[in-house]
């Protein structure tokens, strides 16, 4: 078995501090993305929810989803996103921001694919319009 298969994605990403740095950049991109903010419900949420709180929950979730010791304590994806009526175009903009962030931090291709698979697994609960 390859070493990569024996090491969690969480560890291969560098643990909580590395994940938090990537999430910090990613959420900054998402919060100011004009495509996402053209949706009035998303824009309102971006002004109502603090970026720091959003970053905390996303970091917690990414750590948990990648095999880290953290436990996600936020609401479920459908519950937190259903009222936003996110479209396919907004999802694509979100994914582009995610890809740009991973490129900025030189996340290796194998780990990028694994992270995208995790993100993609949430699409059905997030894209509701």
Which residues does each PLM region occupy?
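Core of compact, soluble alpha-helical bundle domains
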Residues: 1-129
């Amino acid at each position: 078995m390859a070493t990569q298969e024996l090491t969690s994605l969480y560890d291969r990403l560098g643990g909580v501090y590395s994940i938090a740095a990537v999430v910090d950049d990613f959420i900054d991109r998402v919060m100011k993305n004009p495509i996402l903010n053209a949706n009035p419900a998303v824009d309102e949420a971006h002004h109502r929810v603090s970026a720091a709180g959003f970053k905390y929950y996303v970091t917690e979730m990414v750590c948990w989803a990648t095999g880290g010791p953290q436990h996600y304590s936020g609401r479920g994806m459908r519950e937190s996103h259903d009222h936003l009526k996110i479209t396919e175009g907004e999802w694509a903009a979100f994914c582009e921001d995610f890809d740009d962030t991973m490129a900025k931090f030189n996340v290796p291709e194998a780990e990028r694919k694994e992270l995208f698979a995790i993100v993609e697994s949430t699409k059905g609960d997030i894209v509701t319009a």
